[in-house]
UniProtKB/Swiss-Prot annotation:
Gene encoding the protein: davD
Enzyme Commission no: 1.2.1.-
CDD domains, alphabetized: ALDH_F5_SSADH_GabD (cd07103)
UniProt cross-references to SUPFAM superfamilies, sorted A to Z: ALDH-like (SSF53720)
Pfam families, per database record: Aldedh
Protein family according to the UniProt entry: Belongs to the aldehyde dehydrogenase family.
Signal sequence residues: none
Biological source species: Pseudomonas aeruginosa (strain ATCC 15692 / DSM 22644 / CIP 104116 / JCM 14847 / LMG 12228 / 1C / PRS 101 / PAO1)
Keywords for this protein: NADP, Oxidoreductase
Catalytic activity entry: 5-oxopentanoate + NADP(+) + H2O = glutarate + NADPH + 2 H(+)
UniProt xrefs under InterPro entries: Ald_DH/histidinol_DH, Ald_DH_C, Ald_DH_CS_CYS, Ald_DH_CS_GLU, Ald_DH_N, Aldehyde_DH_dom, Aldehyde_DH_Superfamily, Succ_semiAld_DH
Name of the protein this chain belongs to: Glutarate-semialdehyde dehydrogenase
Entry GO terms, CC: cytosol
PANTHER family cross-referenced by the UniProt entry: SUCCINATE-SEMIALDEHYDE DEHYDROGENASE, MITOCHONDRIAL (PTHR43353:SF5)
Amino acid sequence: MQLKDAKLFRQQAYVDGAWVDADNGQTIKVNNPATGEIIGSVPKMGAAETRRAIEAADKALPAWRALTAKERANKLRRWFDLMIENQDDLARLMTIEQGKPLAEAKGEIAYAASFLEWFGEEAKRIYGDTIPGHQPDKRIIVIKQPIGVTAAITPWNFPSAMITRKAGPALAAGCTMVLKPASQTPYSALALAELAERAGIPKGVFSVVTGSAGEVGGELTSNPIVRKLTFTGSTEIGRQLMAECAQDIKKVSLELGGNAPFIVFDDADLDAAVEGALISKYRNNGQTCVCANRLYVQDGVYDAFVDKLKAAVAKLNIGNGLEAGVTTGPLIDAKAVAKVEEHIADAVSKGAKVVSGGKPHALGGTFFEPTILVDVPKNALVSKDETFGPLAPVFRFKDEAEVIAMSNDTEFGLASYFYARDLARVFRVAEQLEYGMVGINTGLISNEVAPFGGIKASGLGREGSKYGIEDYLEIKYLCLGGI
């Protein structure tokens, strides 16, 4: 691992301020999806080690929450500064373990760091209220306090940003956190722990436990010390975690699956729409929860849009993310490849046509050609199921009512996108789409200042923005009598 700072490549878990192995010495191997090579290994921890991390978080909680907001903010700011100072190393580490191109990885590091900066400042803006009393001698005050020990389970597709988007508000609010990162991408998480330690985050405040998803996750959901769980991942696992957390009424934040529609109306700027589709669909090789999963294009511009999209996709450069000029890396594993192939085969069997890509890339491994399907029928599997890969199925629609009905015909409600110029239509469609987020004439909507989250089966709660810190706070009502 060639890094400027070799200490950022950690192969031990970080628990209670110490770098430790699993009790039984077992490890999990981590591979580079672009080459298949083994990068290294991390501890395969279980319930016992997780319990110790939780107990350490509980022990660290009183002192951490007692700090002033400014003191916590200063430590988060230092963590942010260290991420920016080490952006190149962190990005390289991410590309090696996750596969995304280096330019995308650098962008993610900047995005990830922004949550530490933002929520460090928000720590100073945790405001309460005074409410007129219900009797002459009564005074009512509302204060907000940290919920306590929190747990986070994060995915492999954004292995840094999904951590800071949770740890930032948790620590800013005065909570402590135990993190279980994805086993495919643990090194990004461990590098962040190294920088947190350098930033002066006290021991026990932020721990990273690597290992068995079932055992670690089971302890996080069943341990009564943990008062909140935050999870980004599939709806299936989210349902399971929510049920487990219900046993002792834990607070939960869930950012789950998506099935984003990307709508292009007749009056759209087609060049802008193609640019937006390229970003929304093929960024991170389609492995994002907010990527366009269904492209709906109105009859009048259907053929022109497809031609422009084909030309844009043809310019994508597939390869190892560390190589110069590469725009698209590999899929994370063979299972991801199989799902893309399944969706293509199903659509083609029902009448769709492949006009670009459609098969594994000549590079082999988990590389896959960016694919476009046309004349996709409404009953295709891809219309209901999130692909999580470089497949753009282009559906036709006739009018606004039809496309809104098709777009909303899903259990998911995370992100949606549409391109149109008519101002009345912009507001009409935006308000009728049943999604937590709507991108209008843009294919890139994620940032630290906006509330990220979904409705329906896409989750609960919001991350980022001034609302993101609220999920880590409890409201307490004080009634003063005899005044």
